[in-house]
Amino acid sequence: MAPKPKPWVQTEGPEKKKGRQAGREEDPFRSTAEALKAIPAEKRIIRVDPTCPLSSNPGTQVYEDYNCTLNQTNIENNNNKFYIIQLLQDSNRFFTCWNRWGRVGEVGQSKINHFTRLEDAKKDFEKKFREKTKNNWAERDHFVSHPGKYTLIEVQAEDEAQEAVVKVDRGPVRTVTKRVQPCSLDPATQKLITNIFSKEMFKNTMALMDLDVKKMPLGKLSKQQIARGFEALEALEEALKGPTDGGQSLEELSSHFYTVIPHNFGHSQPPPINSPELLQAKKDMLLVLADIELAQALQAVSEQEKTVEEVPHPLDRDYQLLKCQLQLLDSGAPEYKVIQTYLEQTGSNHRCPTLQHIWKVNQEGEEDRFQAHSKLGNRKLLWHGTNMAVVAAILTSGLRIMPHSGGRVGKGIYFASENSKSAGYVIGMKCGAHHVGYMFLGEVALGREHHINTDNPSLKSPPPGFDSVIARGHTEPDPTQDTELELDGQQVVVPQGQPVPCPEFSSSTFSQSEYLIYQESQCRLRYLLEVHL
């Protein structure tokens, strides 16, 4: 197919970068933090600490809300420790104060005190809480962190068991055995839903980020606790810009962050967050945490208990929660062949991902948002690689503006025309003998492209008169091999050729091109690919 006419572009070298930034736009990092803070606190399910000897006694429970998990990290002294306090009550109205403490990631030591009077047990609990935090238990809703003391963190237990318990008037409690309906999804989609909602996958993702999964149990990641992590990083970001008189040191601020968001460093000293690169890594980590919370919250949607004998298959239920239609493409379909060629021609020469399945994606509400750009031309199908832990969140909410790749081209949504570029951001999971990952293809309304050849992390929008920013790399898929797909009446360019050198950008700081848009509505998810990495 003949090459397409080149869109009107402007190329900017390093000497023209300064002073070209458009007006201030909302910072996505801070907007995510504000959104988390606005969410009402979840109703807590409090369980007896599983390491407590009394936890196996069915009559033992936590008295009211007398339960707390405390954390303290001090980098200078290599402290990274927790303290758990619970007031327990058994069926005979005897009371127990359970204390457990130690280094994050370990079982630690414990102590148990028995009481016959509730008031004595309360006094013991409240005394220990004040001793460890310098706060009164009655004023815990207005908790203030103090240097050298523990900080109260919000952790939530997993949901109650899945079997339904139905109360019958004037009779004993009986359990209804539910008959699960057969799954209506095809086998490939069943596997997809299983993978993207896998608790083991979420757990492994958190462990890879050195997070202490015991302090952030799956199913109930505290939104408020994540929001406090955002606040701690904002303070670090300000401190990295330059020291202020009387301000806290980076070590102190880092210690506070690790206290708020518990990390498991084993016996290693927690590293101070003392560079923009480390700060960016922790920002990305919290954004992934927020997406894990979204996926987990979908599954925790409360349903009124019904005494019905049949219930939807769990995979059908999870699929419906996505509010996104996924249509598995036949391997003989023309668009399947086009996408397969796109993958194979632009994938890595050393280890190109092996295509397994393609789904056509139709996310609820995205079509209407995308319609706002119906008159914007120059549309291209582009790659977006991601962590499996955030696939469910993306299918539910679409691609959002998040810092990626160190923010080399500012705060926008990043795409690539070469699969090998986006594949570098794919984090998958082991499934049998294969390492499985997922990649998106999005239709991006590029409009007028503004080209750059050096980093510009301050960008929050294209220059006036432009709709997108392309960080041009040394190579680009051969434009003479491009083809088009018609998607909802729009012609969308799909590269089909191998990458070829771009002499005019041979001195670019980017080896491969990165495509940036700064409005979330300017792209639409079109395809989801399952690949073996």
Curated annotation (Swiss-Prot):
Motif Nuclear localization signal, residue numbers: 14-20
Disordered: region residues: 1-30, 454-482
Function: Mono-ADP-ribosyltransferase that mediates mono-ADP-ribosylation of target proteins and plays a key role in the response to DNA damage. Mediates mono-ADP-ribosylation of glutamate, aspartate or lysine residues on target proteins. In contrast to PARP1 and PARP2, it is not able to mediate poly-ADP-ribosylation. Involved in DNA repair by mediating mono-ADP-ribosylation of a limited number of acceptor proteins involved in chromatin architecture and in DNA metabolism, such as histone H2B, XRCC5 and XRCC6.
Protein name in the entry: Protein mono-ADP-ribosyltransferase PARP3
PARP alpha-helical domain location: 182-300
PTM sites of type ADP-ribosyl glutamic acid: E12, E15, E26, E34, E163, E231, E309, E310, E344, E449
Organism: Homo sapiens
Tissue expression remark: Widely expressed; the highest levels are in the kidney, skeletal muscle, liver, heart and spleen; also detected in pancreas, lung, placenta, brain, leukocytes, colon, small intestine, ovary, testis, prostate and thymus.
